[in-house]
Amino acid sequence: MSQRQSGTVKWFNDEKGFGFITPESGPDLFVHFRAIQGNGFKSLKEGQKVTFIAVQGQKGMQA
C-alpha cells in the first residue's frame, strides 16, 4: 500500500469534476471528484493543501 503524501491543488474544474495536484515531490497528479473523501459536493480549491495516496490509473499515476 502506498503512503499518504501531501501536496497543493494546482487547479480543479467543478463542472468537469477533475483537476491536478502538485505533490511536494514529483510530477503533478490527476484527481477526479470520485477520489475526494467527504460528504456532500466534492470539490477542491486552487492552492488548497491536501493529503492523498498516489495510485496507478488508466493513464498514469493519480491521486
UniProtKB/Swiss-Prot annotation:
Gene3D superfamilies: Nucleic acid-binding proteins
Domain of life from the UniProt record: Bacteria
InterPro entries recorded: Cold_shock_CspA, Cold_shock_domain, CSD, CSD_CS, CSP_DNA-bd, NA-bd_OB-fold
Domain CSD: 7-63
Predominant localisation class: cytoplasm
Pfam families linked: CSD
Regulation: induction: In response to low temperature.
Transmembrane segments: none
Annotated signal sequence range: none
Gene Ontology MF terms in the entry: DNA binding
Keywords: Activator, Cytoplasm, DNA-binding, Stress response, Transcription, Transcription regulation
Paired cysteines (S-S): none
Localization annotation: Cytoplasm
GO CC annotations, alphabetized: cytosol
UniProt cross-references to PANTHER family, sorted A to Z: COLD SHOCK DOMAIN CONTAINING PROTEINS
Protein role: Affects cell viability at low temperatures.
Name of the protein this chain belongs to: Temperature acclimation protein B
